[in-house]
């Protein structure tokens, strides 16, 4: 379902002001990937990059072209595990955060 423009603008505005919100966007994207929801994970990372205007910086750090990074996270994009891990690392570096993974029993 496409987001309404006002909701998207609200999310992007909050991401620009709130470092914890940006970190949570990356965390939620990671969780989506780990849960097998690749499309949601890509969408969240794309929203993060758009909200922070970090696409060029992160693309440079990955030694990739901006367009290549955008395609990777686009609806038909299919990032390799290596590309995904490098992208997560670059996003963490951008926000000066580090994730830890813990097993949770269900």
Q: Which positions does each model-derived feature cover?
A:
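Short, charged recognition helix plus adjacent turn
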Residues: 5, 9, 71, 97-106
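DNA major-groove recognition helix of helix-turn-helix/homeodomain DNA-binding modules
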Residues: 81-98
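Short alpha-helical DNA-recognition segment
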Residues: 50-70
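Residue-level detection of the helix-turn-helix DNA-binding "recognition helix"
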Residues: 74
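N-terminal flexible/basic segments that precede or flank functional cores
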Residues: 1-44
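A secondary-structure capping/hinge motif
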Residues: 77-78
């Amino acid at each position: 379902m496409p987001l309404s423009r006002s909701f998207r603008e609200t999310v992007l505005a909050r991401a620009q002001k709130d470092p914890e919100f940006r970190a949570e966007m990356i965390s939620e994207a990671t969780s989506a990937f780990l849960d097998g929801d690749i499309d949601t994970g890509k969408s969240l990372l794309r929203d993060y990059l758009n909200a922070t205007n970090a696409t060029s910086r992160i693309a440079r750090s990955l030694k990739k072209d901006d367009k290549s990074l955008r395609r990777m996270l686009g609806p038909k994009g299919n990032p390799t595990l290596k590309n995904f891990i490098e992208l997560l690392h670059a996003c963490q570096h951008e926000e000066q955060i580090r994730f830890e993974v813990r097993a949770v029993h269900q």
